[in-house]
Amino acid sequence: MHKILKPVFILFLTLTTQISPFLGNLNLHAQSKDSIILAGGCFWCVEADFEKVNGVSEVISGYTGGFVENPTYKQVVKGGTGHYEAVIIHFDPEIITTKNILYKFFRSIDPTDAGGQFCDRGHSYKSAIFAKPNQILIAKNALLEAEAILGEKIVTPILEVSEFFTAEKYHQDYYKGENLVLTRFGPIKQKNAYKRYRSACGRDERLKEVWGKDAFLN
């Protein structure tokens, strides 16, 4: 019995030794994740912009910055909750850094607009960066860089990160949704309704005016 078990045990040790570094690399990669919360007007648009970025694993639409627990979309857009429409971006910092994300973020919004973003007006549509302690300096530097390039005062605030409430399922991945929605053009798919909304809102046109060729367009 021992003569049979010994070779098996040696084989087990050999395999374990060979596999351990591989498992270690997997664990290291699994830990190489970060996130940042950004408000840039309509969260459908911000989600669409950043889900195409290499290194970003997920973008979730939601609400943050307010004082109402578990707010609904209707409550937030009506006002009085203190919340912003925002997204939380999950990314791999070994592929894309916080600095790179903020570079793209500023070029995907009009950071000189204090009343909202594009055709969407009011507090819930204002832009903001909700920074974790280790992201504050990076955000400040990104803001100063954007301000120097535009030659105008940036009004996008850098705020302390606060609880993020995930928006209703209806709003997630709206820009590529296949469900039918009723519009003034009749029932159309969400993804087509999104394209019409974005175009009518003038988002990309305004970005070109503000940022020129550096605009981060969908």
Describe each region flagged by the PLM.
Residues M1-P7:
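Positively charged n-region of N-terminal signal peptides that target proteins for export
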Residues P7-N25:
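Bacterial N-terminal signal peptides
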